[in-house]
Amino acid sequence: MDRPSVVTIGVFDGVHVGHQALIRHNLQIAQRFDLESVVVTFEPNPLEVLRPDDAPTRLCELSRRVELIAGLGVELVEVVEFDADLASQTAQEFAQAVLLDRLDARHVVIGHGFRFGNRARGTAETLREAGLTVDEYSLLGDVEPVSSTRIRAAVAAGDVVEAAAMLGRPHEIAG
């Protein structure tokens, strides 16, 4: 890392309009404070490791997700392998090892209600306790929050117009 960073963390499946707003907020902070803009995403989706029978169908594969995130102007897309070892890390261990040691984070931008670490015990307060400045950014849509779950439901129902509105682009199927 050339300089300290502002980090946004999430799976970002589909890189929908809510994700895009969160990442744009990251970019604004990076510019304002001369920080490197970093997005952390996980591969595979944590649910594919923690509850494989309940893991959702992906809206896009990792390569497309990275391409979409990078296309927003982020300087680094850091793909963190999600495995049993990472799943067992406490939130404090993750903050220290990934955010502070690996990415030299000073600032973190997260969506409202963001949780991380073993048993999802880490919160915005955990990040603050690690010495990070935290921005909790709301991902609200029209009535309900935009979410990958809502997009999957729209796609399953054949509502490509609604899916495209939430994605900010037409839904794609790779194959």
State where each predicted segment sits.
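Nucleotidyltransferase catalytic core that binds NTPs
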Residues: 1-175
